[in-house]
Design a protein with these regions (language model features):
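Cys/His-rich zinc-coordinating modules
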Residues: 3-159, 168-174, 178-188
Length: 188
């Protein structure tokens, strides 16, 4: 039952449902309609597999911006790799179908996504066009450390303007985003 999965990460078959509910669940099994972050954000803390899946999908979300705009990514098959996935996987990282949740629990979805993420990340870091789209942290201004929003362990992204910063700089400085500050100043 979706409610047990989303609230408790419980996939047991001990819950009985009516024939109507059974048919309905079968019909929606592959439909991506569950926003886990909106329904139960604490679920990511309950399941390491779901947490890892969310990290992979967030990484794909940021990688797609580079891959879909790079002509070299088309030539070396990276765009095709991305497009083998349903678009919601990389466009909406918190949206899941029941099938996705089951495959996450079984580790099957991770086996599909991880090689794709590795291939795309490798392309971005080696491609001159993609690498040129990297960020310099505006807080520390370290030009030798090019950062990318898909490096979730070391970067933070401003929710307002999507600028990218070292997480340590962003959190330690307790500053508002410099780009948002400039934009706000210009409007006055």
């Amino acid at each position: 039952l979706p409610s047990y999965i989303i609230t408790k990460w419980d996939f047991s078959n001990k819950h009985s449902v009516s024939n109507f509910a059974f048919d309905y669940l079968n019909r929606i099994y592959t439909e991506a309609i569950f926003n886990i972050n909106g329904l139960n954000p604490k679920l990511f803390q309950k399941s390491n597999k779901l947490k890892l899946m969310n990290e992979l999908r967030c990484t794909l979300y940021f990688l797609r911006r580079y891959i879909l705009t790079c002509r070299f990514a088309e030539e070396n098959g990276c765009q095709q790799s991305l497009q083998t996935l349903p678009s919601y996987i990389y466009e909406h990282p918190y949206i899941y179908s029941l099938e996705d949740l089951v495959k996450t629990k079984l580790g099957e979805l991770h086996k599909v996504l991880e090689p794709i993420v590795m291939k795309l990340r490798d392309h971005v870091l080696r491609c001159s066009l993609c690498f040129a789209k990297g960020f310099i942290c505006e807080i520390c201004n370290n030009e030798k450390s090019i950062i990318f929003p898909f490096n979730l362990q070391i970067t933070s992204t401003c929710p307002g303007c999507q600028s990218c910063f070292h997480t340590q700089c962003y959190e330690n400085g307790k500053l508002n985003c410099p780009k948002c500050q400039r934009t706000k100043t210009r409007k006055w």
